[in-house]
């Protein structure tokens, strides 16, 4: 749990799943097998860690994602977000929705609202440290229905119960404190916090959150203000 919280965002999703079965009587042999698989993964990636630095300008970017009703036992949804400062991830979370959600759009809105709370805290923290973001932070999502709902200025009977969630995003946009933008699912960094990925995709998303094998780099390179070749391509060119 310490690694997942501090330096290994790639562990967030599997540990969030396993944490649901820690209570006595809830875990079964398949959960123990999954835990051992995580330990084997840790042994084979012991040098993996976050690399911070890169761009000199303070740019706060966030990605939010949800996997609707993916819990077969409860039909609850997995949600996750990540925020990067300059180049590396500085905040991330993978969790499960507290209730059953009625649509994928609703799941994305709940994930976005959770991410917005963290974004506001990070903005206040940077301001207190004397490094406020010079431009509105950007939150990327991969659900166009959510973006359309946040742009509209009317309530409907189907969305009244989640109005407070997307009104926050709308208010922050009107104040110029947030910019919502669409990103394709394959480029959404938060995807690694909502579902199990194929090995190739998992490795690609580790690169996107600036999680690299630190044992392959020299000490001079690790403390360099600029990132090594390849790290600058964490974000698609369209960003």
Report each predicted region and the residues it spans.
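RNase H-like nuclease module associated with reverse transcription
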Residues: 21, 58-59, 95-239
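Conserved helix-loop functional segments at active or binding sites
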Residues: 44-48, 69, 89-92, 121, ...
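Short loop segments at secondary-structure junctions
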Residues: 55, 86-89, 172
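C-terminal reverse transcriptase regions that engage the nucleic-acid substrate
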Residues: 1-47, 184, 192-194
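Structured nucleic-acid-interacting core domains from mobile-element enzymes and related host factors
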Residues: 40-66, 131-133
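Conserved hydrophobic/aromatic pocket- or pore-lining residues that grip, position, or stack substrates
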Residues: 8, 38, 65, 83, ...
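Conserved structured core elements
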Residues: 5, 9-12, 28-32, 77, ...
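RNase H-like nuclease fold core
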Residues: 62-105
């Amino acid at each position: 749990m310490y690694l997942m919280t501090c330096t290994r965002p790639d562990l967030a999703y599997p540990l969030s799943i396993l944490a649901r079965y820690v209570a006595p009587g809830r875990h079964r042999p398949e959960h123990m097998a999954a835990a051992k698989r995580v330990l084997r993964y840790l042994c084979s990636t012991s040098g993996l860690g976050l690399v911070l630095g890169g761009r000199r300008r303070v740019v706060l970017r966030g990605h939010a994602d949800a996997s609707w009703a993916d819990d077969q036992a409860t039909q609850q949804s997995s949600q996750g977000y990540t925020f990067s400062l300059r180049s590396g991830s500085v905040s991330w979370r993978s969790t499960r929705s507290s209730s059953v959600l009625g649509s994928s759009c609703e799941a994305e809105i709940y994930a976005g609202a959770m991410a917005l709370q963290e974004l506001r805290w990070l903005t206040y923290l940077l301001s207190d440290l004397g490094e406020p973001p010079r431009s509105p932070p950007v939150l990327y999502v991969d659900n166009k229905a959510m973006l359309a709902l946040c742009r509209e200025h009317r309530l409907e009977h189907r969305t009244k119960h989640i109005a407070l969630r997307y009104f926050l995003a709308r208010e922050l946009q009107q104040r110029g404190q947030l910019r919502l933008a669409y990103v394709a699912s394959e480029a959404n960094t938060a995807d690694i916090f909502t579902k199990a990925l194929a090995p190739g995709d998992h490795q690609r998303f580790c690169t996107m959150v600036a999680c690299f094998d630190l044992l392959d780099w020299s000490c001079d390179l690790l403390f360099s203000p600029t990132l090594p070749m390849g790290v600058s391509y964490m974000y698609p060119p369209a960003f």
